[in-house]
From Swiss-Prot:
One GO term (biological process): tRNA 4-thiouridine biosynthesis
Biological source species: Saccharolobus islandicus (strain M.14.25 / Kamchatka #1) (Sulfolobus islandicus)
Domain spans labelled THUMP: 54-158
Gene name of the encoded protein: thiI
Role noted for this protein: Catalyzes the ATP-dependent transfer of a sulfur to tRNA to produce 4-thiouridine in position 8 of tRNAs, which functions as a near-UV photosensor. Also catalyzes the transfer of sulfur to the sulfur carrier protein ThiS, forming ThiS-thiocarboxylate. This is a step in the synthesis of thiazole, in the thiamine biosynthesis pathway. The sulfur is donated as persulfide by IscS.
Pathway(s) served: Cofactor biosynthesis; thiamine diphosphate biosynthesis
Chief place where the protein resides: cytoplasm
Catalytic activity: [ThiI sulfur-carrier protein]-S-sulfanyl-L-cysteine + a uridine in tRNA + 2 reduced [2Fe-2S]-[ferredoxin] + ATP + H(+) = [ThiI sulfur-carrier protein]-L-cysteine + a 4-thiouridine in tRNA + 2 oxidized [2Fe-2S]-[ferredoxin] + AMP + diphosphate; [ThiS sulfur-carrier protein]-C-terminal Gly-Gly-AMP + S-sulfanyl-L-cysteinyl-[cysteine desulfurase] + AH2 = [ThiS sulfur-carrier protein]-C-terminal-Gly-aminoethanethioate + L-cysteinyl-[cysteine desulfurase] + A + AMP + 2 H(+)
Localization: Cytoplasm
Pfam families: ThiI, ThiI_fer, THUMP
Record's keyword annotation contains Disulfide bond: no
PANTHER family (alphabetical): TRNA SULFURTRANSFERASE
Family: Belongs to the ThiI family.
Protein name as annotated: Probable tRNA sulfurtransferase
The keyword Iron-sulfur belongs to this UniProt entry's keyword annotation: no
Length: 373
């Protein structure tokens, strides 16, 4: 089976050097997902040749960096002869257009003694007797012929990919992963921009919390382009015991700040250059502008919040698409540790609490459980 893979449009806009790097990473990710076959680059697309019984082909729809792909039939060295293309088109498409209204779409790369319009007209005439008619605007079936120099490719399916950038081209980011609806979506969105997520989870719910986090990451692993996901599970109960020493209204923001501080140490350890969270502006009390400022104050790494402008309905819709929603919805909101959280915490208070608590963030990270998924 031969498959033509079209990279995301934005990859084509890169400089020649960056484009080669992105396409090389995409090819490696595809190899990791498909697990067998031959792949090569040619004139802005990738070709993948695999056994006909390969069951991993549908996984290409979850490989970031792919705009679309199509299983194709091809003929080589047709000597610039349109008649050869017409005959092959009849062989490939006659059953597909049978009894249906159809259209032919053609495009070419290279020098030929015919135009793309010639191909559409001649192939359309040849297929017409098998069909119920032609409609270029609203066909029941579209058939495609793509001529690249001396090779013609025939296909009738264009399967959409997730677009974005190949996972790995943007380096690593440490993701604060609670396991709720938001953090898996934020993780997915950072992978879509080419980042490899390093997952940091503060376990506040014991074995149940751990179980659902692992299930969510198993879903996200299918979108990772073959990259393994490394999970660091911190014992959040010990942190909560510490936080019981400070004023209730400040505890939620302080908990988030502890998470950021541990994430900062993990960035150092994992060679990650950013921290990612599922925070959305003003969604809950800890996510007001003031509290976000206090939470991230003094953190040396950039903090990405890919959901910052999303409302909850939009986030839920994405979670359903990704496949994490069914697990996220079963988890309690473990981070809601105070019913009277303030929407505007004073920075001086938090810094004073932080000094008094004297948490050893390095030790918190050292005592974490590490799992590779």
């Amino acid at each position: 089976m031969l498959i033509i893979i079209r990279p995301s449009g934005e990859i084509a806009l890169k400089s020649p050097r960056s484009r080669r790097n992105f396409e090389h990473t995409l090819a490696n990710n595809i190899r990791s997902v498909i697990k067998e076959g031959k792949i090569w680059r040619s004139q802005g697309v990738l070709f993948l040749e695999v056994n006909d019984d390969n069951k991993n082909i549908e996984e290409l729809s979850k490989v970031f960096g792919i705009a679309s792909f199509s299983p194709v039939m091809s003929i080589k060295s047709y000597n610039n002869n349109l008649e050869d293309i017409i005959n092959k088109a009849k062989e490939v498409f006659a059953e597909i257009v049978k009894g249906k209204i159809f259209s032919v779409r053609a495009k070419r790369i290279g020098s030929h003694n015919f135009t793309s319009l010639d191909v559409q007209r001649k192939v359309g005439e040849a297929l017409y007797p098998f069909s119920r008619g032609v409609n270029l605007e609203n066909p029941e079936v579209e058939v495609f012929i793509e001529i690249r120099n001396d090779v013609a490719y025939f296909y009738h399916k264009i399967i959409k990919g997730p677009k974005g950038l190949p996972v790995g081209v943007a380096g690593k980011t440490v993701v604060l992963f609670s396991g709720g609806i938001d953090s898996p979506v934020a993780t997915w969105m950072m992978m879509k921009r080419g980042s490899i997520p390093v997952i940091l989870n503060f376990n506040l719910g014991g074995s149940v919390h751990r179980k659902f986090v692992l299930e969510e990451l198993s879903v996200l692993r299918k979108w990772s382009g073959g990259h393994k996901l490394k999970l660091f599970i911190v014992n959040g109960t010990d942190v909560l015991i510490k936080l019981s020493q400070i004023e209730k209204r400040n505890r939620v923001v302080m908990l988030k700040r502890v998470m950021y501080k541990v994430a900062e140490r993990l960035c150092d350890k994992a060679n990650a250059k950013s921290i990612t969270t599922g925070e959305s502006l003003s969604q809950v009390s800890s996510q007001t502008m003031t509290n976000l400022y206090v939470t991230e104050y003094g953190i040396k790494y950039p903090i990405f919040r890919p959901l910052i402008g999303f409302d909850k309905e939009e986030i839920v819709e994405l979670a359903r698409k990704i496949g994490t929603y069914e697990y996220s919805i079963k988890l309690p909101e473990y981070c809601a540790i105070s019913t009277k959280a303030r929407t505007s915490v004073e920075l001086d208070e938090v810094l004073k609490d932080e000094e008094n608590l004297n948490i050893d963030y390095e030790k918190v990270l050292e005592n974490s459980e590490v799992i590779e998924i």
